[in-house]
């Protein structure tokens, strides 16, 4: 069975970004994140779940490899401002699983559980049951 890793991610404190910077900047942040996701994961299927939550399905990718790539993305988000005009640094939380034999509903549920563990234990981190 081929490896299939799933990551669900959520921008931390996105409502505060919209409240402080405005919805146009919030939209710019989401576009910026989408571009970075496409650059870091050209082989992934990327979906926006609404709001500021995204899912990545990465085929032929063991979870430890995905975790390394996600950490690179997380660090770039932390260190690179949204733009010169907007000194906003993005923080995000990530939940990662190996899909294995789970149905897609089960996989999304489990990845979401991992995401909320990241959120509930300090945010701006990656949590995986498979680490």
What is each residue range found by the language model?
Residues 6, 85-86, 126-129:
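Short, hydrophobic secondary-structure boundary micro-motifs
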Residues 67, 71, 97-131:
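Catalytic-core segments of nucleotide cyclases and related cyclic-nucleotide turnover enzymes
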Residues 1-5, 12-39, 47-51, 55-56, ...:
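Conserved long alpha-helical elements within nucleotide-processing catalytic cores of c-di-GMP signaling
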Residues 60-61, 102:
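Hydrophobic/aromatic docking surface of two-component receiver
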């Amino acid at each position: 069975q081929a490896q299939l890793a799933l990551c669900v991610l959520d921008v931390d404190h996105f409502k505060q970004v919209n409240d402080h910077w405005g919805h146009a900047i919030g939209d710019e942040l989401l576009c910026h994140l989408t571009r970075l996701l496409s650059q870091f994961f050209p082989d992934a299927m990327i979906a926006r779940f609404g709001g500021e939550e995204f899912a990545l399905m990465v085929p032929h990718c063991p979870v430890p490899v995905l975790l390394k790539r996600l950490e690179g993305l997380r660090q770039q988000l932390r260190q690179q401002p949204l733009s010169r005009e907007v000194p906003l640094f993005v923080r995000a939380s990530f939940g990662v699983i190996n899909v294995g034999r789970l149905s897609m509903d089960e996989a999304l549920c489990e990845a979401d559980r991992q995401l909320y563990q990241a959120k509930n234990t300090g945010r701006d981190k990656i949590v995986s049951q498979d680490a």
